[in-house]
């Protein structure tokens, strides 16, 4: 079954590279209009813009820091002006995620995690909800992580922030359901993308050995789940988490 997103506008944060780009392109190829956004790397943003355009996606380029209210407003204002009202939202932007013993973290790092995974989704949803409420239709798809479900260590800052994001998403799913707005989560496993190129091979081999399906996940695996959750066919699905990790969390 091919899911159609024609007539929709999807904001996917951090969609100039990695999982975000795969999700953005997949939503666009399903028919949605998708702005490309970047925080600092304009060259990468422009390269991604060309890739979206070559895929036949109606798009535009926006620079914005989605951990700030001003940045979120700039992204939505540009998207609304150039593409139309936003009714699909995928908070995906992330920061570095180093494994460290808790004694080696400081609060500033914990705060950066909370900014990306709780503050940013909150600001994005608050800005986007008026249009969704007017339409009585909307999709919010939070990109969480298997780390919360697996209690991965030493990774406390990331696990804590993702746990908060999951709780927020579940609560929002109940609050927004009467308005035809669904809130769901995709929890990827370790999906190697550009920023993992220098990760130690021994760590990669150890993780791969734990995956029941015996292969690495690829960005398309995550993107396909996002297209489904954004579709009409997922209209009666809300408050749910799809773990896309080859069977690492069988519950």
Predicted regions: what they are:
Residues 72, 94, 100-114, 196, ...:
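Substrate-binding pocket helix/loop in short-chain dehydrogenase/reductase
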């Amino acid at each position: 079954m091919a899911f159609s997103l024609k007539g929709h506008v999807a904001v996917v944060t951090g969609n100039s590279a990695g999982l975000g780009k795969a999700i953005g392109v997949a939503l666009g190829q399903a028919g949605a209009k998708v702005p490309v956004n970047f925080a600092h790397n304009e060259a990468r943003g422009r390269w991604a813009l060309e890739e979206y355009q070559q895929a036949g996606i109606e798009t535009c380029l926006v620079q914005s820091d989605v951990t700030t209210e001003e940045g979120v407003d700039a992204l939505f204002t540009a998207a609304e002006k150039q593409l139309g009202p936003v009714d699909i939202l995928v908070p995906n932007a992330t920061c570095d995620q180093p494994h460290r013993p808790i004694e080696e973290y400081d609060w500033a790092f914990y705060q950066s995690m909370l900014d990306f995974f709780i503050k940013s989704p909150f600001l994005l949803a608050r800005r986007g909800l008026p249009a969704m409420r007017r339409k009585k239709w909307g999709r919010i798809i939070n990109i969480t992580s298997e780390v919360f479900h697996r209690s991965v260590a030493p990774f406390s800052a990331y696990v804590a922030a993702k746990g908060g994001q999951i709780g927020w998403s579940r609560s929002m799913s109940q609050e927004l359901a009467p308005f035809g707005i669904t809130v769901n989560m995709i929890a990827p496993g370790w999906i190697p993308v550009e920023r993992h190129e220098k990760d130690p091979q021994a760590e990669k081999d150890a993780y791969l050995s734990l995956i029941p399906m015996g292969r690495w996940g690829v960005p398309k695996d995550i993107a396909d789940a996002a297209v489904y959750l954004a579709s009409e066919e997922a209209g009666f699905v809300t408050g749910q988490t799809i773990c896309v990790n080859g069977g690492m969390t069988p519950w």
